[in-house]
């Protein structure tokens, strides 16, 4: 059989009657059963073609699959229509800056009204010299052992803002009971102005509900 016929036979392009018998003869294998054709790699193993799944040269198989397709090289080299096109250069390479939604509450700055409004002049009058609350002090005890300091300030006639926010509930409750008893014994007043914040007022200091509200709104932390 000529080389051309062998090539045609290998690719299955030659008619069955043109095949020579040596393509079907195997030394250790009998002829294929009637109606059954051996796989191509088995039929042509004797002609120098290795069977599928061989382990002899794995690098050859890697070379077949690792080579990038031709079109990738074209795109990398600036092929028209790719991402290197001038149409996409600025859009793809420059980071896009997304539009930011303006703050929803920006227009409300400086426009607080009502009970939460700060009146600097009113607060100055509330704590100005000669006012009953002019010498007010804020104490932030860490535990019950500081009850003595609260009692001494109150006994000297100083209004005391008692901030118990940093205390645990058990000690805070003990200190509230102490302050309430102290105010009762010295004929003063004991009022709540915020959560875990109380105002102890001596007997000669009359603090109205409006003044207590202003103290809470102005931020009692500013008055030491």
From Swiss-Prot:
Keyword ATP-binding in record: no
Superkingdom per UniProt: Bacteria
GO BP field: division septum assembly; FtsZ-dependent cytokinesis
Subcellular location: Cytoplasm
Extent of Basic and acidic residues compositional bias: 54-66
Entry's Gene Ontology cellular component terms: cytoplasm
Chain positions covered by the region annotation Disordered: 21-78
Keyword Ubl conjugation found: no
Subunit structure: Homodimer. Interacts with FtsZ.
Function: Cell division protein that is part of the divisome complex and is recruited early to the Z-ring. Probably stimulates Z-ring formation, perhaps through the cross-linking of FtsZ protofilaments. Its function overlaps with FtsA.
Family in the record: Belongs to the SepF family.
HAMAP family in the cross-refs: SepF
The protein's name in its UniProt record: Cell division protein SepF
Lineage of the organism: Bacteria, Bacillati, Actinomycetota, Actinomycetes, Mycobacteriales
């Amino acid at each position: 059989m000529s080389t051309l016929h062998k090539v045609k036979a290998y690719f299955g392009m030659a008619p069955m009657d043109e095949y020579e018998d040596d393509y079907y003869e195997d030394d250790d294998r009998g002829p294929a059963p009637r109606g059954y054709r051996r796989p191509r790699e088995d039929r042509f193993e004797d002609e120098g073609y290795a069977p599928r799944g061989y382990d002899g040269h794995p690098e050859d198989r890697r070379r077949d699959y690792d080579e990038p397709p031709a079109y990738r090289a074209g795109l990398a080299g600036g092929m028209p229509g790719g991402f290197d096109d001038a149409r996409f250069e600025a859009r793809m390479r420059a980071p896009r800056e997304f539009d930011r939604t303006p703050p929803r509450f920006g227009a409300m700055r400086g426009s607080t009204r009502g009970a939460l409004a700060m009146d600097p002049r009113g607060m100055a009058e509330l704590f100005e010299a000669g006012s009953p609350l002019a010498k007010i002090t804020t104490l932030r005890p860490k535990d019950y052992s500081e009850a003595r300091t609260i009692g001494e300030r109150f006994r000297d006639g100083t209004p005391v803002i008692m901030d118990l926010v940093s205390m645990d509930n058990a000690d805070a409750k003990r200190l509230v009971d102490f302050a309430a008893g102290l105010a009762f014994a010295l004929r003063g007043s004991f009022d709540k102005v915020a959560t875990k914040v109380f105002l102890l007022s001596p007997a000669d200091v009359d603090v109205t509900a409006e003044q207590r509200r202003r103290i809470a709104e102005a931020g009692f932390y500013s008055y030491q």
